[in-house]
Regions:
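A short, conserved structural fragment
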Residues: 58, 62-72
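Short, amphipathic alpha-helical interaction segments positioned at domain boundaries
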Residues: 83-105
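Short alpha-helical segments that sit at the start of domains
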Residues: 1-27, 32
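Short, Lys/Arg-rich nucleic-acid/phosphate-binding segment
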Residues: 71-76, 82
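Short acidic, hydrophobic short linear motifs in intrinsically disordered regions
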Residues: 30-46
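Residues in the recognition helix of alpha-helical DNA-binding motifs
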Residues: 57, 79
Length: 105
């Protein structure tokens, strides 16, 4: 699948997807097992984020070929198309901040 500029922008439009992609530019980490734990001892917001990651954001990045995701091992690695989005990730304002929150000149 050839990714378009619109695809790249969609991939980084959400803060959770953007943070995942930025983390992969620094190294090829494993996704934290605790992040996908839905136990009642976790704050509701954390459980909601984990559910969103599992059911929305990670599948979207997989479909784009940007990541490889082993659900059983809760492991995320760079996908076959990852190198194509790296130039965009490199120029994001503040690198880890919201695009609209960055106040740099």
């Amino acid at each position: 699948m050839a990714l378009t500029l619109d695809d790249h922008l969609e991939a980084v439009a959400n803060v959770y997807r953007r943070e995942m992609l930025l983390a992969l530019t620094d190294h090829n980490p494993q996704f934290d097992r605790a992040a996908l734990t839905y136990g009642s001892n976790q704050p509701l917001e954390d459980r909601q984020v984990a559910l969103e990651m599992e059911h929305v954001h990670l599948p979207k990045l997989v479909d784009m070929g940007l990541i490889r995701w082993n659900r059983g091992e809760h492991e995320v690695k760079k996908g076959p198309e990852f190198e194509k989005i790296e130039p965009l990730l490199a120029v994001l304002p503040g690198r880890r901040n919201s695009l609209v929150d960055d106040q740099s000149p």
